[in-house]
Amino acid sequence: GKATTKKVEIPERDRYDNGYDNHGHDDFEHDQTEVDIQEVVRKEKESYDHNERDIYGNARNDFEHVQTEVDIQEVVRKEKESYDHNIGDRYGNIHDDFEHDQTEVDIQEVVRKEEESYDRNEGDRYGNGHDDFEHDQTEVDIQEVVRKEKESYAHKYRR
């Protein structure tokens, strides 16, 4: 079947500074990458010897724990649009055989820090006993959005 693309409207103010361009380009090359995120939520490594208590007062049996938690929801949309000579694009720009590659992803970041205190032999939520335990936890839920565009414009069009 024929490939279809969904037009994505991007406000002009988000693309150019204060009407700097106003739809007129002089052989304009534009490479844009918005948002480069690499986020690690929580990483911990705990080593326990046989029947020795860990830093939380828990008893383990030769336990090796490496934990990396990242909760990422990623939405990626790629579209490729070709414009023929003298055909205006969605922004009203005229292109000469224009190739447009767009990758969009949106980012919302929620960070929660919680501190938990445990008294001696008062089991925590995992059923572990702690001796005045202080726990700092940072959880990040990320929706990642990245936009990449490359645009070539001829210099003949003025608005």
UniProtKB/Swiss-Prot annotation:
Q: Which residues are the signal sequence here?
A: none
Tissue distribution of the protein: Component of the organic matrix of calcified shell layers.
In residue numbers, the region (Disordered) covers: 1-33, 80-159
Highest taxon in the source lineage:
Eukaryota
Q: What is this protein called?
A: Gigasin-1
Q: Which organism is it from?
A: Magallana gigas
Q: What is the lineage of its organism?
A: Eukaryota, Metazoa, Spiralia, Lophotrochozoa, Mollusca
